[in-house]
Amino acid sequence: MRLNILNDVVDYFVLTESPFTVSGNEKPLYYQENKDRFGKFNDKIVHHVTEEIPNDFTHLLEKTKFHVAYKNNDPYGTPMIDLPVRFQRALFNRNNSAFGIEKAGATDEDLVITSDADEIINPLLLQDLEWFNPSNHYVAECRAFYYKLNFLYQEDWMGSRLCTWKHLKNTTIDQHRQDHQKAHKIQDAGWHFSFFGNEEDFKLKLASYEHTENNTDQVTSTASEKIEQGLDPLGRTNKLVTVPLDDSYPQYVLENQDKYAEFISAWN
């Protein structure tokens, strides 16, 4: 979906993946194993594989290329070397994506958009860049949807980050991710489609990412109920609201509702 939505407004898709989750479990290289399914986009995809995610990060105490110095504090005042190893892995994996951007041949003036796979910036923003100031960095405030394309979460999501390659390569990708309070915010700038799939997909997502505090029996045992009833995946108080598919959605989604019918809930 995101490739179709953004194909006409980007030069390259830099796709970074690893054979390990940040929890340390082995996982497939999904793009590499399904490359034939991406035939339309393969000429635009720059694939970067982080072959190994360390268990010990003491060799990164001092700053190295594209990586932060792990002796420094995170935004909450904890030295990064003292964080749980799953967070250190996530930090490493995210920052390592910059090598893929370098591989794509980015120049200092190029606009670089960094996103999680489930974050899609609005392509209309990229058709006219008069608003973009190369001295600034930006965050796209996105509408968030869980389970279904039209199960709307009632708080915006801080999604894709935008800046020049010159700016990004002299900081780190994770720093841009964490410093969204300092970024210039672009309102209604995209979509965050997350926790899509069935009950097993729900559980796999929670088992794979760094926030293992959410991977509890209390959360996962009610996965099916949450999906069916539109309840917050992590047990927060906000209930999801079913909304109509209208012109606030990507044109590609509106034109392919039959293709995504299983992910659309009736709103009438």
Spans of features found by a protein language model:
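Acidic donor-binding segment of Leloir-type glycosyltransferases
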Residues: N7-D82
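Histidine-anchored nucleotide/phosphate-binding helix
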Residues: M1-L6
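Catalytic-site signature of metal-activated, phosphate-bearing donor transferases
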Residues: N55-D110, T114, E119-N268
